[in-house]
Amino acid sequence: MQFIDRAEIEVEGGKGGDGIVAFRREKYVPAGGPAGGNGGKGGSVIFVATQNLQTLLDFQYSRYFKADDGKRGGPNNCTGANGSDRIIKVPCGTVVYDLDSEEIIGDLVTPEQTLIVAAGGKGGLGNRHFLSNNNRAPEYALPGLEGEKRHLRLELKLLAEVGIIGLPNAGKSTLISAVSSARPKIADYPFTTLIPNLGVVRKPTGDGTVFADIPGLIEGAHLGIGLGHEFLRHIERTRLLIHLVSLTSEDPIADYQIIQGELAAYGRGLEKRSQILVFNKIDAVDEETIDNYQKQFAKITNAEILTISAVTGAGLTTLLAKVWQQLEQLERVEDETPSLFS
């Protein structure tokens, strides 16, 4: 499946139905009063978040969505039928922007969350509405109003608690396949992963936590070089990052600093996101090499360093225990943080 995480579309609410001019025409009532009904309301275009979609691919083929118009009013003061709403499913994590104002209209995070993106127009008033002491037989009515029209940009930001970051070939896809049921494409060359891979990892309690392997992070990613500019924003929703460093790289320290620099350059607080620093591929180097790199890293960071082999499974139990501990601490801090609205 092709992964599409950005789309531009047009949406339009339905037009309100017209009010009508009509008079009572009953037997024995030769001069009946006004009886023109109001028009029905136009339908609205409504987004509904769903967990059954993981991409905005559908919007590559359909870019215009319109709700039904309201029906015109009827005689005998009958109001026209309302137009049907146009319901559009979008993935959880979709952010909706108005392209004309560049304002965020909404952020659809939870399943079944709804957002009206184009309201339907009001129905026009029939001549019955204009009856007054001064005008006992109004011969005019109002047309329905046009529905709201909008040009939208949709951006999908993956909903994952834990993001796995690192340079290409650091072993991110191998790690996510080792700890979850995800089966991403894996090969021994850079840029194997061209889309974010999601995997659900089970806690000891049985609850699932979503991990995301974030691809495309290279030097200059925040400027749009490589794939990074498209994927850095997926990190924004994560609560915890696993920073994977391959010990078979020519310069693991430079690799680490490149990623840290890209997070800082992108901004939005990514450089302050909680991280677990992990040496990967310890099965491919000797103990002396591991020890030397631990000493070198200790000079540039105070972070605790975990060591794993995503291939053999060495150290994965310790890593996951650390992840659960960190997430629990983050939840405790968030619970203790006073709300601005309390």
From Swiss-Prot:
Extract the GO molecular function terms from the UniProt entry: GTP binding; GTPase activity; magnesium ion binding
Localization per record: Cytoplasm
Residues in OBG-type G domain copies: 160-328
Question: Which EC number(s) are documented for this chain?
Answer: 3.6.5.-
Coiled-coil features, chain-numbered ranges:
none
Annotated Gene Ontology cellular component terms: cytoplasm
Q: Which UniProt keywords apply?
A: Cytoplasm, GTP-binding, Hydrolase, Magnesium, Metal-binding, Nucleotide-binding
- Tell me its family: Belongs to the TRAFAC class OBG-HflX-like GTPase superfamily. OBG GTPase family.
Query: What quaternary structure, including any partners, is listed in this protein's UniProt entry?
Result: Monomer.
The molecule here is called GTPase Obg
Highest classification ranks of the organism: Bacteria, Bacillati, Cyanobacteriota, Cyanophyceae, Oscillatoriophycideae
